[in-house]
Amino acid sequence: MSNLDFCTIYTTTGQIDQLSYAQKAADSGDTCIGMKSKHGVVLLAEKPRVSPLYILESDEKIRKIGNTIGVVCTGMSSDTFYVGCAIKDYVFHHKENFNEDPTPGMMKVYLNDIFHYFTRGINLRVLGANTLTSVYKDGSFSLLHTDCSGKTLSYKAACIGKGTRRIKTELEKLDIDTMTIEEMVDVGVKVLYMAHDPSKDKEFDIEIGIASMETGGDLRKLENHEIRPLVGKYKHISVDED
């Protein structure tokens, strides 16, 4: 008997094939990185140059949700747009009810709820998106990774999108816990270029958001002139260079 893979039905092996297909869609998305140390959180997003007429600022990858929450998504553009709006809606209602931004624990619940809804109905398509969420609460930072199944876990560094395999290997070599914001930004830009293959990948720009003690946990986007020196430093790095 062939497996039923057109909806969220279990196969004979106990799997849901649509989850695997959705994850493949997310894995083909633009590369995004999150890193967390005791000093704060850094989010980086790759932004391929789709046209010479492309306006960089028109495509916002990293979104500020509330005062102390930042989100970056990758995967199918329609799904990443929905996820960003859904997270914003959950955070808005939480703040309306409790007069504060959600804790990391509550954000896990909200992220689970958003993604799980699409894995339980036979008439729904699983979301082809992964997210990285930064949360600041009571003097500490959290970085949450959510996959297509809705599984949400805390990480000190995580990567989503097509460069995940190479970048994860590089991140595992680092002592991220003690790194400063500046060091995490520097390393993040470096590994983005290490995972880039000029022979088959488009040129890209980089969007960076930081949340630190200095910003009060508030997510701040770096300006182009702050990113440009790092791009010049690493844009010619070899894909095979260690």
Swiss-Prot record:
Any Pfam family the entry gives: Proteasome
Cell compartment(s), UniProt: Cytoplasm; Nucleus
GO biological process: proteolysis involved in protein catabolic process
InterPro entries per UniProt: Ntn_hydrolases_N (IPR029055), Proteasome_alpha (IPR050115), Proteasome_alpha-type (IPR023332), Proteasome_sua/b (IPR001353)
GO terms under cellular component: cytoplasm; nucleus; proteasome core complex, alpha-subunit complex
Annotated keywords: Cytoplasm, Nucleus, Proteasome
Top-rank taxon: Eukaryota
Gene3D superfamilies associated with the record: Glutamine Phosphoribosylpyrophosphate, subunit 1, domain 1
Family to which this protein belongs: Belongs to the peptidase T1A family.
Task of the protein: The proteasome degrades poly-ubiquitinated proteins in the cytoplasm and in the nucleus. It is essential for the regulated turnover of proteins and for the removal of misfolded proteins. The proteasome is a multicatalytic proteinase complex that is characterized by its ability to cleave peptides with Arg, Phe, Tyr, Leu, and Glu adjacent to the leaving group at neutral or slightly basic pH. It has an ATP-dependent proteolytic activity.
Subunit structure: The 26S proteasome consists of a 20S proteasome core and two 19S regulatory subunits. The 20S proteasome core is composed of 28 subunits that are arranged in four stacked rings, resulting in a barrel-shaped structure. The two end rings are each formed by seven alpha subunits, and the two central rings are each formed by seven beta subunits. The catalytic chamber with the active sites is on the inside of the barrel.
Protein name according to UniProt: Probable proteasome subunit alpha type-7
Record gene name: PRE10
